[in-house]
Amino acid sequence: MSASKDLCVFYLHGFKSSPASSKAVMIGQWLAEKGVAYECPALDISPLIALDQIETLIDERLAEGFSPRLIGSSLGGFYATWFMEQHPAKDQMRAALLNPACWPSRDLAGQVGTHKAWHSDEILAFRDTYLQDLKAMEVGLSHPERYLVVAAQGDELLDWKDMVARYPGAQHLVIPGSDHGLSDFPDHWPAISDFLLR
């Protein structure tokens, strides 16, 4: 078991989101109260660049002696899954996935084009080649017990049943109602933190 002071939590935001999301800010505040290290990078819309950003941060924190804990929201959950299965230090990791995007190469096919970011005036260009990159990032699960999947039945963008089916053997927290952004997130943080901070 790791002491919480030896952990670093990485929050990986979703499509068009940012470190300014309400969940990212709340998690940062809660972890600061516990003295737990926290990273919340502003991920590029390019999947390959986003992976490089995340990998750089994880490797830096590993070199400092931290064990990574991942929280991935929506598309960030897909990225977290890739690291949980592909990173050389995956045996040190655990991940909580919040309404994770299971098959983004399919689900984001209609999003090719330009978009305004959620929390700024930045214009994001999502290219069709990114769908191929996402398809290539699909991985199987080697240790599903290291995942907690939080799936809201009221998710208006993604099907919660896909989330449960994608992660057999994981711990599942299925929430009646709620929504894609988990507007009731504070209610579920105790269970998430109990899973991650050990």
What kind of region is each of these model predictions?
Residues W82-Q86:
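Active-site signature of alpha/beta-hydrolase-fold catalytic machinery across serine-
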Residues I71-T81:
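Gly/Ala-rich beta-loop-alpha elbow adjacent to hydrolase catalytic centers
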Residues C8, S67-R69, R94:
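Structural motif
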